[in-house]
């Protein structure tokens, strides 16, 4: 238990430090918290795509085959979480479509990089890194494109066109985005079986490493521009990410009879707090949601308790 607490302190304290730094910079006027377009372009078009490409391309095909059950469990758990949150956002809270989409992404796509990597590598070693890569793969190739299609479909330039044409155009536009093309290119590179040349790997890694810090700083910056809010929508988002998604994953571990570390990794990945993808996508499409940013912050805070509990549960799994 002391090991998990040490890993958590080393993982979550840096997350809150960078969030606080962004908040301070915006609140004190050091950085313009109303004009974040340049930071978002850096994230969405350069840093994040490089990180996603490497995260997928560095995985081996053999490992991908062994991780197939994990891929299935995470796809179902994350997909159901996204669907549930989207339904709540639209039908219960009556949130506009764009905000509903980015809010659902926040509540279903975990902070795999900033929290998942140190947590699972600290517990399971290199195998934990592969499990995290699977989580990123599911989010990047399933949840992100769905969200982008909704955002593109609701773009003001598309509003006057028939629904069918808007959907086709939105799908085409979303798959041209670097954040979707990059993991697809990484998957293609992986299947071809060519090792990434060292200079290319190091070059992409250099900019890719800035992703987490930039995303968390941007979130803090956006929080400084809007009041923090605790609403029914925020509570629902936290409930879905921190409790419902882990419960779904745990049920699927037993349904698919995942034994050993694979089942434990699937469960722990589902317990990770909300990630920054929703914030980044929202900033790109001018969707400024106080609730979305509040979910990210509170979900991370609550994970200080939920992750140790989940770890204790995981060690008793078959």
What are these regions (language model features)?
Residues 1-318:
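Alpha-helical transmembrane segments of multi-pass small-molecule/ion transporters
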């Amino acid at each position: 238990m002391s090991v998990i607490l040490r890993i958590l302190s080393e993982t979550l304290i840096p997350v809150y430090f960078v969030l606080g730094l962004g908040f301070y910079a915006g609140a004190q006027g050091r950085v313009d918290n109303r004009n974040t377009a340049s930071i978002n372009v850096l994230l969405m078009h350069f840093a994040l795509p490089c990180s996603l490409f490497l995260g997928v391309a560095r995985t081996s095909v053999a490992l991908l085959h062994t991780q197939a059950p994990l891929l299935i469990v995470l796809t179902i758990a994350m997909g159901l979480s996204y669907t549930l949150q989207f339904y709540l956002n639209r039908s219960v809270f009556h949130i506009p479509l764009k905000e509903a989409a980015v809010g659902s992404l926040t509540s279903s796509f975990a902070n795999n990089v900033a929290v998942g990597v140190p947590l699972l590598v600290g517990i399971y070693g290199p195998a934990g890194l592969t499990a995290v890569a699977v989580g990123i793969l599911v989010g990047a190739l399933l949840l992100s494109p769905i969200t982008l299609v909704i955002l593109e479909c609701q773009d003001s330039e598309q509003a006057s066109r028939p629904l069918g044409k808007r959907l086709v155009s939105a799908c085409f536009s979303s798959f041209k985005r670097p954040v979707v093309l990059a993991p697809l290119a990484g998957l293609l590179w992986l299947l071809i079986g060519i090792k990434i040349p060292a200079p290319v790997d190091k070059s992409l890694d250099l900019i890719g490493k800035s992703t987490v810090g930039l995303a968390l700083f941007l979130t803090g910056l956006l929080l400084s521009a809007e009041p923090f809010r605790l609403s029914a929508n925020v509570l629902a988002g936290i409930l879905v990410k921190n409790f419902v998604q882990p419960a779904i994953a745990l049920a699927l571990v037993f349904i698919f009879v995942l034994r050993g570390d694979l089942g434990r990794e699937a469960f722990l990945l589902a317990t990770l707090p909300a990630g920054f993808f929703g914030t980044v996508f929202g900033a790109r499409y001018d969707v400024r949601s106080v609730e979305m940013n509040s979910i990210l912050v509170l979900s991370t805070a609550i994970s200080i308790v939920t992750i140790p509990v989940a770890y204790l549960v995981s060690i008793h799994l078959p």
